[in-house]
Amino acid sequence: MKKTIKYSILGVIAGAMLASCETEPETGLVRLTHYATFDLIGGEIYSVPVGGSYSEPGVVCMEGTEDISDKVKTTIYDISGQVVNSIKTDEITFYNVEYSAVNVDGFSSSATRTVFIYNPDVKGSCAGKFDVDMDNTTYNGTPIIEAATKRGYKTSAEVTITELCPGIFYTNDFLAGWYEQMRGIGASYAMYGYFKLNPDNTIDLMYSHVNGWDDGLDYIQNGKWDEETGTLSYESGYAGQIFINPVLKRK
């Protein structure tokens, strides 16, 4: 089973309502059904230094006043959405741990904990809203302003980068808005994903995905964050033929 994860600090998904009503088809009478609710011991966000140890904190699951914690199913997803057997702490990444349960009437609900494996030596942050530097960003070796103008595309774009925990970031578009904003073909063609910031302010790709084509980047290289100028830059390769080297300026 694969789930596409997009900025997946999810919290409690279903269980916002403690109970609801349903009608018995045989009698037309209305009775109360209690959805399972979850109390994540240790919270919805759990951080472990790389190389440290992780022990499942557990969850308390209630159906009304009845404790049904022993009926909870636990599923672990890695950063790409693949189901895995356990959480490993030997590399910087994150996992989503989904807790689900079905109540006596067959209604399911779930909650999710995000477990970050992070580098405590990272002190900087490249989070924020960025303008794409249209003159210095290149598309297949050409300034992207020229490539966009030649094709009649929009000649500006912006990117938002969100810090998930120290050193781990989510971007809404690794491709600097080329398809979604400049070409204007929609949000399904933004290359969202995750990258890590290292203590020396270089960056490395963790995961990327574009829903419209169901694939990701070939690579990111020579990535760096300049705290003084607020500039993030890297070289990216996509589909073996698209080479976009973004230069992003923090607003």
Name each region found by the language model.
Residues 4-11, 15-44, 122, 251:
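Bacterial Sec-dependent N-terminal signal peptides
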Residues 104-111, 240-242:
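Short, exposed coil/turn segments at beta-strand boundaries within extracellular/luminal domains
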Residues 66-108, 117-118:
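Serine/threonine-rich, repeat-prone extracellular segments and beta-strand-based repeat modules
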Residues 121-251:
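Ser/Thr/Gly/Pro-rich, low-complexity flexible regions
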Residues 26, 45, 110-114, 156-158, ...:
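Well-ordered beta-strand positions in beta-sheet-rich domains
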Residues 60, 98-102, 114-116, 131, ...:
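Residue-level recognition of well-ordered beta-strand positions that form the cores
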Residues 34-67, 155-157, 165:
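Solvent-exposed, low-complexity, repeat-rich "mucin-like" stalks and linkers
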Residues 88-92, 114-131:
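N-terminal helix-cap/turn-to-beta initiation motif at the start of protein domains
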